[in-house]
């Protein structure tokens, strides 16, 4: 005897057991298909190396750079980035704002970098923002 209409469940695309949220796996580890051996995947290290190299080639096309020098420059860029971001965050908090705008970045650059260097940095930053704004319209 066929089941009554009230006893039937509506058809679903996925089985009931698959409705659970998928389990999170470790990002740095992958298990091999055979045996208990575990294969680790390399974690990506994000650096400014490619950008530093491009700028170097624009300024001095025939000059190279060692890995050690590239590492030092990368650390330098990370340090300056962190200082500017921290200062901009403080400025936004002082003004009771939850968003860091170009104004906070500009002010933090003026506070962190000395004299002429700050003027050039602000000038180049303004130029970059203007170029970006005109290209997105």
Curated annotation (Swiss-Prot):
Residues 1-45 are annotated as: Disordered. There is a cross-link at residue 131 (Glycyl lysine isopeptide (Lys-Gly) (interchain with G-Cter in ubiquitin)). It comes from the Eukaryota. There is a cross-link at residues 8-9, 24-25 (Glycyl lysine isopeptide (Lys-Gly) (interchain with G-Cter in SUMO)). Keywords: Acetylation, Chromosome, DNA-binding, Isopeptide bond, Nucleosome core, Nucleus, Phosphoprotein, Ubl conjugation. InterPro entries: Histone-fold (IPR009072), Histone_H2A/H2B/H3 (IPR007125), Histone_H2B (IPR000558), HISTONE_H2B_site (IPR055333). Its main location: nucleus. The modification Phosphoserine is found at residue 12. GO terms for cellular component: nucleosome; nucleus. Pfam families: Histone (PF00125). Coiled coil: none annotated. Residues 1-10 have a biased composition (Basic and acidic residues). It is found in: Nucleus; Chromosome. GO terms for molecular function: DNA binding; protein heterodimerization activity; structural constituent of chromatin. The modification N6-acetyllysine is found at residues 8-9, 13, 24. SMART domains: H2B. Monoubiquitinated by the UBC2-BRE1 complex to form H2BK123ub1. H2BK123ub1 gives a specific tag for epigenetic transcriptional activation and is also prerequisite for H3K4me and H3K79me formation. H2BK123ub1 also modulates the formation of double-strand breaks during meiosis and is a prerequisite for DNA-damage checkpoint activation. The nucleosome is a histone octamer containing two molecules each of H2A, H2B, H3 and H4 assembled in one H3-H4 heterotetramer and two H2A-H2B heterodimers. The octamer wraps approximately 147 bp of DNA. This is Histone H2B. It comes from Pyricularia oryzae (strain 70-15 / ATCC MYA-4617 / FGSC 8958) (Rice blast fungus). The lineage of its organism: Eukaryota, Fungi, Dikarya, Ascomycota, Pezizomycotina.
């Amino acid at each position: 005897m066929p089941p009554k209409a009230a006893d039937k469940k509506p058809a679903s695309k996925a089985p009931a057991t698959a409705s659970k949220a998928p389990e999170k796996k470790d990002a740095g580890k992958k298990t091999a298909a055979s045996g208990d051996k575990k294969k680790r995947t390399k974690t990506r290290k994000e650096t400014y190396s490619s950008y530093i190299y491009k700028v170097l080639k624009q300024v001095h096309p025939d000059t190279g750079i060692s890995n050690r020098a590239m590492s030092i420059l990368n650390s330098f860029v990370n340090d300056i980035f962190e200082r500017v971001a921290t200062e901009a965050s403080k400025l936004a908090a002082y003004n009771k704002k939850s968003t860091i705008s170009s104004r906070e970045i500009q002010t933090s650059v003026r506070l962190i970098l000395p004299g002429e260097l700050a003027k050039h940095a602000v000038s180049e930053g303004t130029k970059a923002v203007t170029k970006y704004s005109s290209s997105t319209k």
